[in-house]
Amino acid sequence: PLHYLALSEVLDEVEVIPVISTEGYGDFPGPEVLTLSGTKNPAELKDYIDSLYREEYYKGVVRDDVVDLVPDYMRPLIKERVVGKRVPEARKAVVELLRSLGKHDTIYEVLNGPIYCRCGTEIVVKVIRDQWYIDYDNPFWKSWTLKALDQIDVVPESSKRDLARAIFSLKKRACSRTRGLGVKLPWDESQIIDSLSDSTIYMAFYTISHKLNYDPEKLNEEFWNYVMLGNGNPIDLSKSIGIPEDELKALREEFSYWYPLDSRHSGRDLVQNHLPYMIYNHLAIFGENLVPRRIVVNGFVRVGGKKMSKSFRNIYPLYKAIEEYGVDPVRLALTVSSELSEDTDFDTSSIKAITDQLRRMYDLAVNVSKLKSSGENGLPEKWLLSLIHYKVREVNDLMNSLDFRKAFNVILYEFYDIVRDYISMVNFPNKYTLKTVLNIWSRLISPGAPHIAEEIWSMFNEDLVSLQRYPSPEELQVDGQALVQLEYIRYLIEQVKALASLTNKQPEKLIIYVSNSDELGLLRAVLRGLKDRNNLRELSSAIGLREENLKTLLEKIQTLPSTLRDFITVYSIDEFKTIIDNLNFLMRKLDVDEIQVYRSDDSSAPDIKGKKNSTLPLMPGIVIL
């Protein structure tokens, strides 16, 4: 219909040859568009043409008389494969027939066009003759690249498979073009080097770019061969190009210091092109010893759960976010909203929540700075520093594995909760202990929130936190006994809260039954067996417990905090005494008026709701009243 309309505007008469028959339409539905062509509503004409195309494509069949339109030798094939067929099937048959006869040609069309350059110019597809290419399908080079990929740490691991598939599928690729900005191809100045060909190793240039204060004419091929490949003699090179020998050596040392790349971060859309080319080209130029050590594939930024797009009207410039919320909350919100390889959702509610949490941490630091007395230095202080030791270790491990989301969640929230628990435990908080913790916290959060880190650091120190080393767990000693006892108390609080939530009842009084300390040996035996990776049958036989009972015990053990599981095999605990010693803290934390504690083997103790005999080591029976 559209073609008919176009032809009718330039020709007096248009001969129409019907090919498709569509039920409900005449032999020539095209001329009907002339009736609508004068409409004042172009959308009406477009809707009609689109609906006609759809009807013909999905419901139309090829007419019987099309055989009269082809030469005699083709008529049997047309009658067999095309006549009476629906349009999609007939199209495929015609293409195959023309291909077999050598009578077909291919026209490439940009289906999602028009496409525009960043400068606003419409992009056109052009065939370039005598174009240079790089043969990424060379079998030796391809196998060498796949082998090198095995030695590269890829985050996430799934992207390594995607990279391998991309490398395996790469063919010859043009490395030059005839127009646009760029460097001319050295051996063919009619061509310009395509950016994707050489931009995959530009990181090597960054290593020395800040020191290249020389005339460009001096930076010849021998210069680059020495600086980046170590080829040649700096004495001879110095005489040849006029750059002092010590400066040449310094450039070579600078490059050698930074290369190979420790970590290459890139968007996941570049897994199919830039990143595999980078590995290929690093191998070809520098050899396998200087390929990147790690490749990290990032996701994209989304706003309100949607991809940033002008059509969605949700473009949120970074400067606007910083002006509204500040640098630290924006950085942390983008970091903790998703895993590194996933899309990051820019959510204003998340930013506000992080802002509130930073303010809470700041207020806490202010209160600590105002403390007059050092306070006590007992079990709670030892527990606090011991637990912070493990949190620092956890954060370091997460940072090293690039799991920034979990790392900053630990720093932001778990640290704060731990400090609040400590303050609730004691009558007079120890200022020195809290200062130690806040100094560690400032250094931990500094990469994500440098401004708040400096503010809190300055409350207790004269210099800058940005000049300090990142915290190490070795800075703090561990008191296993204190850690076991107070982690048990915190675990007990969690269990009571979970039970209260399950029963939908706010407790006023608690009855707690604890296991006999002698039964702790059973739990230790199970935990040691798990560390030794014994299977269920071996473990059951070793400790003399039926497999069904062992399964139940293992399920309950998994609910214990990791610190308890790790240290209970070394340190003992008297659950009864530990609870009694921390009754005030428990009552404040759980907001109850009374707590009664009994040993499960105490014959004089009442059995409330059958909980007396339900205890296991570190897993008390709890009654809410």
Residue ranges of predicted features:
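C-terminal low-complexity, glycine/proline- and small-hydrophobic-enriched intrinsically disordered tails
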Residues: 348, 352, 464-625
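Alpha-helical recognition segments enriched in aromatics with Gly/Pro capping
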Residues: 1, 10-11, 17-23, 164-342
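Charged, glycine/proline-rich intrinsically disordered loops and linkers
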Residues: 38-81, 214-252, 530-573
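Core structural elements
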Residues: 122, 170-177, 356-364, 381-393, ...
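Residue patterns forming the tRNA-binding/recognition surfaces of aminoacyl-tRNA synthetases
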Residues: 1-189, 199, 317, 321-350, ...
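Acidic, turn-prone loop/beta-hairpin segments
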Residues: 374-396, 409-413, 417-494
